[in-house]
Amino acid sequence: MSRQKYLQMVVTLAVLSMPFSANAADAPINAGAGTTVTVGDNYEIEMTGNGSTAVAAAQNANVTLGNDAKITVDGDSAYGVQTNGENSKIEFGDGAGIEMTGNAAVGVETSADNSHIKFGESAEIVLQGDYNYGASVWSENSSIEFGADAKITAVSNAVRVGGNDSQAIFGADAILTTSGDNAYTVHLGAASGSSITFDNGAVINSDGHASIGVFIERSGEVSFKDQAEIKVTGDFAYGVYLQNQYDGNVSKITFGDGAQIEAHGYNADGIHVEAENSTAEFGDDTVVIVSGEDSTGVSFGGAGSKGVFGNNTYIEASGEYSEGVYAGGEGSSIEFGSNASVVITGNDSYGARVYAADAVINFGDDAVISVSGEDAKALCVSADDALIKVGNNAQITAEGMNAQALLLWADGNSGKIEIGDNATITGNADTDYQSNLIQVMSENGVIEIGDDVKINYNYTGTDEVIGSALSVTDAGGKIVIGNGAVIRVDGFDGGAEIIGDGGEISFGDNLDLSIVNTSYANGLRVAGEDARLVVGDNAKIHINGSYSDGVLVGASGYDGMSAAFGKNAQIIVEGDSSNAVRAEAWDGKGAKVEFGADAQIIAKGDAVMGVSAGGENTIIDFTENVNVTIGTETVPSNNGSWGIEASSGATVNVDGLAQINIFGEDSMGLQAVSTGKIILERAIIKAVGNNTTAVLGDENGGEIYIGGNSIVEAEGEGAKALSATAGYV
């Protein structure tokens, strides 16, 4: 008997003993232990029956099929191809096709240890029915390998690896698709040592409720080369999911360049890492797009988990409560290279948020972070000892009702946001209560911004509102900004404010701050108990609005606050009833403001004030020269404008030369009342206007000291150079 006839007889006997019918020309293959079966091209098997297996290999058996093999099986719990014996091997040529119809069916599976199945190019596996698996490595030290252009379509699971130290390997341009609820397109479930790898151009699709594109259940690694695409659609769907385990196992997923991950549906996430100490790595040009309420682009919730992204990452999220980047595991970290973009649309959304102790999100240079929506926040740290860091040249934008660019909102003591040099931070916001573009609401938390920042805060509504570009509202909070800051506020009423006790805001040299189109504005405000403002040299503060303050240090019921300016400060207010510099504190310790050399104080409008100090122990100190100008000759400041006033035990002191020019009717150059004190080492005081007084006092004990070589002049009908009563010198 020839070998060919012998094999045909063996196969025929095997077929007759099985509980199914074979209708095709070619018989099923059931290779016995230690046998070798080889068939040529275009081999076709059609089977019907529950529990059927079209191609099987027992222990140490080897089966080889040529090109364009076709297997069709109709039946529940059936197998298209199965290694059911150890050390067995099944190999297909190019163009293999496997179609399974029935529930709990498996297209290809290694069921015995040390067994292997291999396909050439263009293999296709299609399964119809629930709880099915396209390719399953269900044994240890085993593998299933596909050449280029493999395609698997299933309802429940396209590929799974459940055996330890096993592999599933896909060549270039693989396409894997699932369509059922709770489906896993790629599933790595082994406890240790296993992997699933994809060459360039892999496409992973999953469409169903709670479906997952790539699921690492326990440990091991899934890796993709360049240009991978993952798309999931359905509520609670995840593009990539690394599940947390409590047995210490660690998982990893890696992508080459050009990966694109999409997740669409309620509570859908693009990348979701819960596994502790696990890693997700991405090359350059990664794109993550999610949509749906509560959706998140990148989420790392596992303690010690780590995400690494190359350059040019783009993350987009849309939907209420959506987030771009989220670090929620203690000690977790997410790092981006240069040119990252995060674009978020939705109410109560976040661009990037840290919500766990010691967690970090780090963006490289040239990052673009944009949020749009009511109560949206571009960058938010809401955990102690946590950090968001952004490199140079960042562009950060927040738009919408109460939208914020930077928010430090931590329960502990040392949350932090760091922004590099040359940043542009923009807010285009409406508000229904007090809103702040950059805010520290964390005890002892810190926001640091480098040199040459441009901050633009624009009110888009129509009502008068309260809102500051910079705000420290909690005790001990701090904002530190480098040299060359340019701050433009349009419609809101605050430039920078410190409300928290012991809080601090500091600027380097060359601060340029302006506020327009508002009233009751405060350029720089220090209101917290023992709070402190520090401003370097050459600062310019320009406020255009009535009832406003250029610099306001003090608040009712608080004291001990202070402000210090370097040399060449210029404070300008334009608007009726406004004050250029005002310090008021009434609880004993007083407030203190100090200016370096050659300060300029300018106030324009009716009933304006240049410098005003009030309250016991309150001091405004000009260390070397000051120029105070109220009104102009062509546009005078009438109706009781003042150059310098001290009241209620406060002191204004000028070392060097004080030049004070007052233009306006019924106005005053100097006034000290109610035990207030003004001390000028040398002065040139000129008051121009009807009923104007250069130096004015009353009977309540105010004191004015003007040193030698001073000049006091008054011009106008009823004008007086000096009107001194009790207490004046």
Enumerate the language-model features and the residues they cover.
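Glycine-rich beta-solenoid repeat tracts in large extracellular/virion proteins
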Residues: 25-33, 53-59, 79-86, 106-113, ...
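Gram-negative bacterial Sec-dependent N-terminal signal peptides
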Residues: 1-24
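Beta-strand-rich solenoid/repeat architectures in extracellular/passenger domains
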Residues: 23, 35-51, 63-77, 90-104, ...
